Amino acid sequence: MNRVNIMRLSAFTVMLAVLSSVCSGQRLTGPHPTGDVPAPVALDTHGLFQEKFARVGDDVFISGQPTEQGLRDLHAQGVTTVVNLRTPEEMSTRVPFNEPALIKELGMDYVYLPMRGTPEFPYSADALKSFAAAMSGAKGKVLLHCTIAWRASHLWAAYLIKYRDVPVATALEQARMINLMDDMRMDGDRQPVEAFLGRTIPEVGHPKR
């Protein structure tokens, strides 16, 4: 590892340590979450996450695809559950390491919810329910990721609306702070957040195809 990469990893580790030391007491994971859901904070990826990396409260991270080192660093900072939304094809052809094997090696829980808005991998109410179960069952901090945090942002918005009683406009605003982009859409007539919730949401964009 060259000097530049060592300095980058050191800066990332320090950043996470500082964030961990400034705790708000808002626990979003586990069976008894506390407090209102705070707005996400965009963080520097330090080259360890693809395009996006954000923190919500004290114990949730939402990101694009993490690198091997990114996962190791998050594990060192207390992440115990990784939720991956990428499809098997994406993982086998676009990720240069075995993510499930690394997570097992690190002793973290791996929750695999592949989704892409296709008949085989739909955005569905069942996927949202499974994510909510992962949140409530987590023993520590949680990382939710896809490729660039777009799918993850939609899932997060749906989770806030259904399971945390966050107003729709607020949930969408917070998800946009991560990477929910209204100018992108799934195949069909609904945005992913609508498919997760099983209803139309006028507040989300519906660009013409």
Protein language model features and the residues they cover:
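Bacterial N-terminal signal peptides that target proteins for export
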Residues: 2-11
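Coiled-coil-like amphipathic alpha-helices with heptad-repeat character
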Residues: 3, 21-22
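Bacterial N-terminal signal peptides
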Residues: 10-21
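Cys-dependent protein tyrosine phosphatase-like superfamily
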Residues: 23-142, 157-209
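A phosphate-binding catalytic loop at a beta-strand-loop-alpha-helix junction
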Residues: 143-155
